[in-house]
Structure formats: C-alpha cells, structure tokens
Amino acid sequence: MKAGPLQLGVVPPANRAIAILDFFLRPIAIVGTLASAIAMATTNQTLPFFSQFIRFRAKFNDLPSFTFFVVASSIVSAYLILSLGFSILHIAKSNLVNSRVLLLLLDTAAMGLLMAGSAAATAIVQLAHKGNNKVNWFAICQQYNSFCKRVSGSLIGSYAGVVVLILLILLSGVALSRR
C-alpha cells in the first residue's frame, strides 16, 4: 500500500495556500477593527448654545452602546494580533489540527463579540439619524453632523472586520475538512 502525502509528512499545497490566505486576511481584519475602535473612541463634537459660554458636547462615552462597541472592537483587535502567531505556525506546519480547531472556536467567538458591538452601535446610530417619534426621541444628526458621520464611518470598518472573520471561519472549516 502506498503512503499518502500526510503519512509522509508532506504538507498538501492546498492547506498551505489556505494558511497563507489566513495570514493575509488577519491584518485586514486588524486594520478594520482597530481603526473603527480608534475612530469611535476619538469622536466628539461641541455645539454652542445661544452664546459661546453655553455649549453642548456629544462624546462617544455618553452612550453605553458606543462604549461597548469600542471595548468589543479593541478586544477583537487584540485577539487578532495575538492570533497572527498561530497563523504563521500554520504556514510552516499546515497539518496541525488542534490549533486550527482552537482558532476556529476563537474566531467564532470574536466574530460574535464584534457583531454584538456593531449591532448595538448601529441601533444607536439609527436613532441618531432618524429619531423615534413614538417616544419623542428626536434625530440629533442635523445638529451633530460631524459626530454622526464619524460614528457611522467607524461602523463600516467594524462590519468589514465581521466579514473578514466570517471568511477566516470558513477557511478554517475548509482546512479542517481536508484532513
């Protein structure tokens, strides 16, 4: 009976290509999540009211959903930076199963956390843009235009990170199924 490539210790080229793609997708997710956390955390706008001495200020930490978004995005960014080591390890040794399963589970948890933070922030951004007439919550984006634009922009990077994490989860699944 002839030995297969895994029995000989040879890494199949398809698994190596998946590991390389995994390594290149992680920095993209890092940039998206880290940029969105920084953009949200540095968002504020001050408006004068009647005179220069009375001002209203809008900051991201005025709303707990935005604070949760920043914390969730920061945690996911830190995880993605730390997971680059496993990604490099999989390029060198593509037949490691336990670390691939661990990455699959942690990527799924990170995607869930990032999606929860993004969804919470999206709900508040929707209220800021549209308001809610039934409970007399008025839209504030006409007054705090730059605040709303910056907050909305930070959501784009976060959702891009969610999409990349979904791709990473799929890649891990494909790599595990080829075993």
Curated annotation (Swiss-Prot):
Chief localization: membrane
List of glycosylated residues: N44
Any one GO cellular component localisation term in the record: plasma membrane
Cell compartment(s), UniProt: Cell membrane
Keywords associated with the record: Cell membrane, Cell wall biogenesis/degradation, Glycoprotein, Membrane, Transmembrane, Transmembrane helix
Membrane topology: Multi-pass membrane protein
Spans traversing the lipid bilayer: 18-38, 68-88, 101-121, 155-175
An example Gene Ontology biological process: cell wall organization
Superkingdom of source: Eukaryota
Cytoplasmic side: 1-17, 89-100, 176-179
Residue numbers on the Extracellular membrane side: 39-67, 122-154
Function: Regulates membrane-cell wall junctions and localized cell wall deposition. Required for establishment of the Casparian strip membrane domain (CSD) and the subsequent formation of Casparian strips, a cell wall modification of the root endodermis that determines an apoplastic barrier between the intraorganismal apoplasm and the extraorganismal apoplasm and prevents lateral diffusion.
Quaternary structure and interacting proteins, as annotated: Homodimer and heterodimers.
Family of the protein in this entry: Belongs to the Casparian strip membrane proteins (CASP) family.
Identification of the protein by name: Casparian strip membrane protein 1
Naturally occurring in which organism (per UniProt): Lactuca sativa (Garden lettuce)
